[in-house]
């Protein structure tokens, strides 16, 4: 087998592979002979069909199968021979496949960059120290009362905490867009649910009033067809309703599923939830800090094929069609996020390799059981379904390995305690989920 490799652009490689004809022809003949002993054809006894008859009937199919398998086998062999590490799947272009001649094909692909993780001694991480206070509990209980409020229609101008029921219809440059209209939409003023333009327009509005609201969508919106564009909404106010909050008593606790212990048991349940939220938020804040700084400390040339694949995944997650060529103007909306994910993925994988980090099976099983318990199904059935879902299991393995890498990184870098309130922790951008 002869192999030659040329660099196309950046990390791109074009590998030409020539395979001796004997490797293909010998395998074709072997399979045809094997088939002649098994195939049933009219006019011949079982196992006595001549090879030339089998070749005439099945030769093209057998040859196609052999060519496909030989290409797969020799592609892997050629990569090993040339010490190449491809990033993603290759594009295979056959050059010669004729009977009796050497097989020749070209494989085009990106290779992984050479990576030596550096700068760990320059990473400084703030480790949040957060105490759950009685005031935090009171804030949550007040939010629960508001969430379970009854609303009563009132004949006055709308104000904060009122529920305003509206019909709206929006257009961009006179054209409708996905999600542009709704009827009887209930909106709570002052709850942070609404764009600022809607808040300003609805404050002080009364039932029966019609108004026009303009809203500019964020440039970084995941849906590129409306990102950065201004929509004009025609709004009709149908009702203004004020909240009637329930009393914080044992009956209210029972409404929330606390059958014994009343308000005190409810407070303990809320505290437990806040403790879990605190743990998760602290972890995500640490993870975001260490991964962001890891990326900043290491400059990498990124394989274009991996970025393209990540962009396609982001488009699918946003509900956009992932088919067809992506215009450059829309590509830029995804490219920064996609590049960050690819970069962190490469760095994490290199740390897994260089530090010999092995999948923690016990940690993975714990996460599996938590997923099953939170699925809303019978936990044992849910566990079995998840375990049989290969894609989900691969995603879970990658997530657990990534968490193990974060653990290792946090042991290497400099950390400093920082006291925060619970609200400061939960409202910080650093508390958002980070992922490679």
From Swiss-Prot:
Cross-referenced InterPro entries: PPIase_dom_sf, PPIase_FKBP_dom, Trig_fac, Trigger_fac_C, Trigger_fac_C_sf, Trigger_fac_ribosome-bd_bac, Trigger_fac_ribosome-bd_sf, Trigger_fact/SurA_dom_sf
Domain (PPIase FKBP-type): residue spans on this chain: 161-246
Enzyme class label: isomerase
GO CC annotation: cytoplasm
Region ranges (Disordered): 1-26, 81-100
Gene Ontology biological process: 'de novo' cotranslational protein folding; cell division; chaperone-mediated protein folding; protein transport; protein unfolding
Catalysed reactions listed for this entry: [protein]-peptidylproline (omega=180) = [protein]-peptidylproline (omega=0)
Molecular functions (GO terms): peptidyl-prolyl cis-trans isomerase activity; protein folding chaperone; ribosome binding
UniProt KW keywords: Cell cycle, Cell division, Chaperone, Cytoplasm, Isomerase, Rotamase
UniProt-annotated location(s): Cytoplasm
Enzyme Commission number: 5.2.1.8
The keyword Lipoprotein is annotated on this UniProt entry: no
Domain remarks in the Swiss-Prot or TrEMBL record: Consists of 3 domains; the N-terminus binds the ribosome, the middle domain has PPIase activity, while the C-terminus has intrinsic chaperone activity on its own.
Family the entry assigns: Belongs to the FKBP-type PPIase family. Tig subfamily.
Purpose of the protein: Involved in protein export. Acts as a chaperone by maintaining the newly synthesized protein in an open conformation. Functions as a peptidyl-prolyl cis-trans isomerase.
This protein's name: Trigger factor
Protein source organism: Halorhodospira halophila (strain DSM 244 / SL1)
Source lineage: Bacteria, Pseudomonadati, Pseudomonadota, Gammaproteobacteria, Chromatiales
